[in-house]
């Protein structure tokens, strides 16, 4: 008999068929076990779980006594209680490599659209405000040759540094737990303290995940150390930045502008002051949202689950100490 799994996000038909070759697939639209008796029953038998979103904590795991592996269609896993999973011997799989280039593209798009005021000015043209040759009140600022400061030199940070260095001749500064030799050799990047990064960067680009250590890492004190001409770009996790202090800094001119793909609360509330500011480009967490990359993420997650439940995992495991070997 095939192992039973719960699939709680729609995936392409060919990937669903790939899962079905190995497992009995129970498909659901999201994880709401309180309202879905069928889901509760499926979780009781499930050895595998695959999807994205939802809160996978100790209480949820009690509903799935036979679970051996969970595969998230994302690189982030802050909605999973990793400690609880590990205590149960459940492998947690994610997709850290397939979205790198696309997220770096998104960050460059945010840099360009924010610096050149693309969204704001496009809306003004649509509103019929372009009646004559534009004056300096419609001007933006250059991106090329400006200093980029990357907070978090991981895979996405490296891909962003490559674009900035080779595409826009930007000096690269970065802050991370340790120096990154490849970044320094390939892009002439300079490892520096957070204070130096804040003081010297024209674009502060945040790629950090959400952890206890990174929560509100950028707050009032840090924003005050930035150039008044600086632009903040966040495509890491919303809570890395104290959103209320960011709003104040954008309103009073402490910093020039912000391009944001992530927020403390998602979806962003319709009454958020961020939506009233002309110096903000806000997009709905589109970092990896292309047809190609989302397909590749789903395919990676499918392969991850197959590998985890067949004992053939070689990569992409968040808690490798519990890897299934049988």
From Swiss-Prot:
Catalyzes the NADPH-dependent reduction of glyoxylate and hydroxypyruvate into glycolate and glycerate, respectively. It comes from the Bacteria. It catalyses: glycolate + NADP(+) = glyoxylate + NADPH + H(+); (R)-glycerate + NAD(+) = 3-hydroxypyruvate + NADH + H(+); (R)-glycerate + NADP(+) = 3-hydroxypyruvate + NADPH + H(+). The active site is at 237, 266, 285 (proton donor). The lineage of its organism: Bacteria, Pseudomonadati, Pseudomonadota, Gammaproteobacteria, Enterobacterales. Homodimer. Keywords: Cytoplasm, NAD, NADP, Oxidoreductase. The keyword NAD applies. GO terms for molecular function: glyoxylate reductase (NADPH) activity; hydroxypyruvate reductase (NADH) activity; hydroxypyruvate reductase (NADPH) activity; NAD binding. It holds the Pfam family 2-Hacid_dh. Its EC number is 1.1.1.79, 1.1.1.81. Belongs to the D-isomer specific 2-hydroxyacid dehydrogenase family. GhrB subfamily. This is Glyoxylate/hydroxypyruvate reductase B. PROSITE patterns: D_2_HYDROXYACID_DH_1, D_2_HYDROXYACID_DH_3. The keyword Cytoplasm applies. Coiled coil: none annotated. It is found in: Cytoplasm. GO terms for cellular component: cytosol; plasma membrane. InterPro entries: D-isomer_2-hydroxyacid_DH (IPR050223), D-isomer_2_OHA_DH_cat_dom (IPR006139), D-isomer_DH_CS (IPR029753), D-isomer_DH_CS1 (IPR029752), D-isomer_DH_NAD-bd (IPR006140), Glyo/OHPyrv_Rdtase_B (IPR023756), NAD(P)-bd_dom_sf (IPR036291). Its main location: cytoplasm.
